[in-house]
């Protein structure tokens, strides 16, 4: 069999060091059973970041994926495709491939609608398919591949095992196939905490670098009231202060997934129906919008028939319907594009995109390096050979010496409140280390469109601050060590200020949304 080529070196010193380690391991294990894992680890270093969307059944995983991509790609009903791990990648053309547990991959024809939602498995049973891979031209997928997983608490042991295998939480020897996780929960259950604990297998001191928690279906927290998202934001803020979650995920964000997905795919005919509802008398609206059953089944003189109302309820949810009607009535949304923008802003999708950009996409090199290091570590443990000691030494040199991992360890220390710094210093340190996002402008608390000179000036000021802290006679040893890490970060920010691009959350918006007026 022809050996696939090793991926070429890239611009990241950390990735280059990890790539060299993987290559050396490949030479040591040449022709042995470890080679498939090492080839896979090498390829992942050059692939887009892999981010799984995980959670319990009915947490809204597929709905959130549709919102992030801005297309109705993932099936949200209980069909057979929701029982299969499905990968969504940026591609030149639309294509769906099924990868059976045995046998070669096979292309699947589009469903009756011409898309992915109703695609047929081509005679395969769901339990015969290891994964589906959907290629779709999408700017939202250009920086990260999204992986939709079955519910973690499925009554089917096999479905839960599939999700856990993809995420590397099944207790087996296989490594996670993804670099990071968006974990959806409707409320904080003990099972959510247990899952997040199992995914925390990081060589950089087991920190929460690779996990963002989302309070999904946030509109249901307030029982469909117009202020439901405000209630959800308060709940998410409370969860974010929970010491258990602080150790397991970077942040907790409220998102109304259904509302966000509908905002991204809103149609003109839906806007016209909402406008018709908004023109009805207040008394008639109050009568209809008491319960979902009344809204879909009651007779009314409003020129939106019950079947159409039921379709609107499926698309918007009760909260989304009430909010959309109010936005049209108040003149805030006078076009479909305006309503789409307003719903998207209120659904919480913007902060989630910012988090995905700042905490995942901008840290892609660190997350991918972490995944490759985990793969090498597993190989060294499973197949010890005489050269293992040398490889192990290089592995430990990278994990202990890479500044990116030093930043992660210090972020974990700050989250734990274990440093004797003032509150202001803790906030500044957390930001400079990339805790709020890895982009230079975010680290330095300056405008994202700042010039290189402005970035450099801010970096020099931060450098001087932490140099003083490192040298201050009252600083404890732990504080001095932390300040030295921050000094190194600031030095890199100063040196790189002339070449930093301004990267923001807009990069992850779907193309259709970026074109809205």
What residue spans do the PLM features occupy?
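Pre-Walker A adenine-sensing motif
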Residues: 33-43, 135
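N-terminal J-domain/J-like co-chaperone modules of DnaJ/Hsp40 proteins
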Residues: 405-517
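Short, flexible helix-adjacent loops and helix caps
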Residues: 26, 30, 73, 223, ...
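C-terminal end of P-loop GTPase domains and the immediately downstream helical coupling element
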Residues: 212, 221-223, 230-403, 407
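Charged, amphipathic alpha-helical linker segments immediately N-terminal to NTP-binding catalytic cores
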Residues: 1-29
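Heptad-repeat amphipathic alpha-helical coiled-coil interaction surface used
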Residues: 22, 26-29, 35, 463, ...
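Globular "head" domains of long coiled-coil molecular machines
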Residues: 46-287, 346
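Charged, low-complexity interaction regions
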Residues: 26-32, 385, 502
């Amino acid at each position: 069999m022809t050996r696939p080529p090793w991926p070429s070196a890239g611009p990241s010193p950390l990735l280059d060091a990890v790539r060299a380690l993987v290559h050396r391991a490949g030479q040591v294990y040449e022709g042995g059973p470890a080679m498939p894992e090492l080839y896979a680890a090498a390829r992942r270093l050059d692939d887009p970041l892999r981010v799984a969307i995980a959670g319990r059944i009915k947490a809204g995983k597929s709905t959130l994926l549709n919102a992030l991509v801005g297309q109705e790609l993932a099936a949200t009903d209980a069909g057979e495709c929701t029982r299969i791990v499905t990968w969504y990648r940026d591609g030149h053309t639309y294509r769906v491939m099924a990868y059976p547990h045995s046998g070669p991959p096979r292309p699947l024809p589009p469903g009756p609608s011409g898309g992915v939602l109703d695609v047929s498995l081509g005679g395969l049973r769901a339990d015969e398919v290891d994964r589906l891979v959907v290629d779709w031209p999408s700017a939202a997928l250009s920086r990260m591949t999204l992986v939709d997983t079955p519910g973690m608490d499925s009554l089917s042991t096999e479905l839960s095992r599939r999700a856990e295998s993809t995420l590397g939480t099944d207790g087996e020897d296989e490594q996670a196939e993804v670099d990071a996780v968006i974990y959806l929960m409707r409320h904080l259950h003990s099972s959510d905490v247990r899952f997040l604990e199992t995914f925390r297998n990081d060589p950089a001191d087991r920190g929460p670098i690779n996990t963002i928690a989302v309070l999904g279906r946030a509109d249901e927290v307030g029982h469909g009231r117009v202020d439901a998202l405000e209630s959800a934001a308060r709940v998410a803020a409370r969860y974010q202060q929970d010491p258990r979650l602080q150790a397991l995920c970077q942040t907790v964000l409220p998102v109304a997934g259904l509302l966000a997905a509908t905002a991204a795919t809103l149609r003109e005919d839906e806007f016209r129906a909402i406008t018709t509802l908004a023109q009805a008398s207040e008394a008639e609206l109050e009568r209809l919008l008491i319960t979902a059953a009344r809204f879909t089944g009651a007779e009314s003189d409003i020129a939106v028939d019950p079947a159409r109302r039921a379709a609107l309820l499926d698309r918007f949810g009760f909260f989304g319907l009430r909010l959309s009607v109010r936005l049209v009535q108040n003149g805030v949304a006078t076009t479909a594009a305006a309503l789409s923008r307003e719903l998207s802003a209120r659904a919480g999708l913007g902060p989630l995109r910012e988090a995905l950009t700042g905490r995942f996409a901008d840290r892609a090199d660190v997350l991918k390096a972490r995944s490759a290091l985990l793969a090498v570590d597993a190989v060294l443990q499973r197949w010890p050979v005489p050269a293992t000691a040398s490889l192990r030494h290089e592995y430990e040199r990278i994990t202990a010496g890479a500044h990116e991992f030093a930043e992660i360890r210090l972020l974990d220390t700050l989250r734990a409140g274990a440093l004797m710094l003032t509150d202001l210093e803790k906030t500044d340190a957390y930001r400079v280390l990339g805790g709020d996002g890895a982009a230079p402008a975010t680290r330095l608390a300056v405008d994202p469109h700042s010039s290189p000179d402005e970035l450099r000036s801010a970096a020099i000021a931060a450098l001087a601050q932490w140099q003083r802290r490192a040298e201050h006679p009252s600083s404890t040893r732990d504080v001095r060590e932390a300040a030295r890490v921050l000094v190194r970060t600031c030095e890199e920010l100063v040196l790189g200020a002339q070449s930093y691009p301004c990267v923001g959350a807009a990069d992850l918006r779907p193309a259709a949304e970026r074109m809205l007026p």
